[in-house]
């Protein structure tokens, strides 16, 4: 029973790669600004999982500190990006990034 409960580095890294891949897929293929922001958040969460995984198996606190920094950075990025998306929606009545190619106003 003990061998089934142990989670190794490979499990964490696999989850991280899946999250990163989903985030990159969302950023590269979608045109909706909100979905793109969600993809960026998935990429940042994948980086957090990597930092915490290597921190756990290395024994240092550097990964935790980097992870906290990324969380703060993600919160600031989300606030600024959502403000920009709201202004784009008010101006152009859409959040489609392909239709917003010029910012004349």
Swiss-Prot record:
Record carries keyword Transmembrane: yes
Cystine pairs: none
Keywords assigned by UniProt, alphabetized: Cell inner membrane, Cell membrane, Membrane, NAD, Quinone, Translocase, Transmembrane, Transmembrane helix, Transport
Transmembrane segments: 7-27, 34-54, 66-86
Enzyme Commission code: 7.1.1.-
EC supergroup of this enzyme: translocase
Any GO molecular function: quinone binding
Family: Belongs to the complex I subunit 4L family.
HAMAP family: NDH1_NuoK (MF_01456)
Quaternary structure and partners: NDH-1 is composed of 14 different subunits. Subunits NuoA, H, J, K, L, M, N constitute the membrane sector of the complex.
Function summary: NDH-1 shuttles electrons from NADH, via FMN and iron-sulfur (Fe-S) centers, to quinones in the respiratory chain. The immediate electron acceptor for the enzyme in this species is believed to be a menaquinone. Couples the redox reaction to proton translocation (for every two electrons transferred, four hydrogen ions are translocated across the cytoplasmic membrane), and thus conserves the redox energy in a proton gradient.
Protein name: NADH-quinone oxidoreductase subunit K
Organism of derivation: Chlorobaculum parvum (strain DSM 263 / NCIMB 8327) (Chlorobium vibrioforme subsp. thiosulfatophilum)
Organism lineage string: Bacteria, Pseudomonadati, Chlorobiota, Chlorobiia, Chlorobiales
Protein encoded by which gene: nuoK
């Amino acid at each position: 029973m003990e061998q089934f409960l142990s989670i190794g580095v490979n499990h964490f890294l696999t989850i991280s790669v899946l999250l990163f891949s989903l985030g990159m897929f969302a950023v590269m293929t979608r045109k909706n600004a909100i979905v793109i922001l969600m993809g960026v958040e998935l990429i940042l969460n994948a980086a957090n999982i990597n930092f915490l995984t290597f921190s756990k198996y290395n024994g240092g606190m550097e990964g935790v500190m980097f992870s906290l920094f990324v969380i703060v950075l993600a919160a600031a990025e989300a606030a600024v990006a959502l403000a920009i998306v709201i202004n784009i929606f008010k101006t152009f009545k859409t959040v489609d990034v392909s239709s917003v190619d010029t910012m004349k106003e």
